[in-house]
Curated annotation (Swiss-Prot):
EC number: 3.6.1.9, 3.6.1.12, 3.6.1.-, 3.6.1.23
Name of the protein: Nucleoside triphosphatase NudI
An example molecular function term from Gene Ontology annotations: dCTP diphosphatase activity
UniProt motif Nudix box: location: 38-59
NCBIfam families: PRK15472.1 (NF012016)
Cofactor: Mg(2+)
HAMAP family noted in UniProt: Nudix_NudI (MF_01846)
Lineage: Bacteria, Pseudomonadati, Pseudomonadota, Gammaproteobacteria, Enterobacterales
Keyword Lipid biosynthesis: no
Domain of life: Bacteria
Keywords recorded for this protein, A-Z: Hydrolase, Magnesium
Organism for this UniProt entry: Salmonella schwarzengrund (strain CVM19633)
Domain Nudix hydrolase: 1-141
Pfam family, one: NUDIX
SUPFAM superfamilies in the record: Nudix
Length: 141
């Protein structure tokens, strides 16, 4: 089984949290709402990976004004690729509290939508199990 270290930003701006709706046909949680993030490449520093993933998934214009390591966890997930293949992966999540200086988002094709959500409205979204766990651990659910 392959192992991946995943950097995952919990991005907050003006009291709201950024959620991204995964594409329906790929990813670990197709069609569900999630936090952004992705894998650390070999030789890449963790904060560099976090900033790269934010740029790739959310666009160059989103500015993170604060990044603080928060917690970590692990689990085993099945990833679905765009061609329909599936793979079981051992995932190590490094989760960061992040504050953005703006809300300028340009999502890539991994996502079909995004939303800035007030804490009291987070439970209304179809959150994947990992995001639900993270938000509950943070006291937001």
């Amino acid at each position: 089984m392959r192992q991946r270290t995943i950097v995952c930003p919990l991005i907050q701006n003006d009291g709201c949290y950024l959620l991204c709706k995964m594409a329906d046909n790929r990813g670990v949680f197709p069609g569900q709402w999630a936090l952004s993030g992705g894998g650390v490449e070999p030789g890449e520093r963790i904060e560099e990976a976090l900033r790269r993933e934010v740029r790739e998934e959310l666009g160059e214009q989103l500015i993170l004004s604060d990044i603080t390591p928060w917690t970590f966890r692990d689990d085993i997930r099945v990833k679905t690729y765009a061609d329909g293949r599936q793979e079981e992966i051992y995932m190590i999540y490094l989760i960061f509290d992040c504050v953005s200086a703006n809300r300028d988002i340009c999502i890539n094709d991994e996502f079909q939508d995004y939303a800035w959500v007030k804490p009291e409205e987070l439970a209304l979204y179809d959150l994947n199990v990992a995001t639900r766990h993270t938000l509950a651990l943070k006291g937001l659910l």
